[in-house]
Amino acid sequence: MTVEKKDLDWGNLDFSYRKTDYSYVSNYKDGAWDEGCLTTDHSITLSECAGIFHYCQEVFEGLKAYTTVDGSIVCFRPDMNAQRMADSAERLVMQ
């Protein structure tokens, strides 16, 4: 399913899951990210040792982007979002 930008109900977007035609996947290895790729496979593979299965710490900060009257896309206070993420990670000793 393809949804055109003009057909989205921008005022009511939330953080619930919305399946898209493609997902972007990039891997981090040896201190660097690879070039990544688009895929139609929406599944992920997790190691049995993944912290998410072991009551680990986690931080979520939602950054939203909006379309302005002139059609530009802007992020709402990304600097403050990044600071909140860093503060939360520090509180959980994740830095």
Where in this protein do the model-derived segments appear?
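Conserved alpha/beta cores of soluble small-molecule-handling proteins
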Residues: 1-95
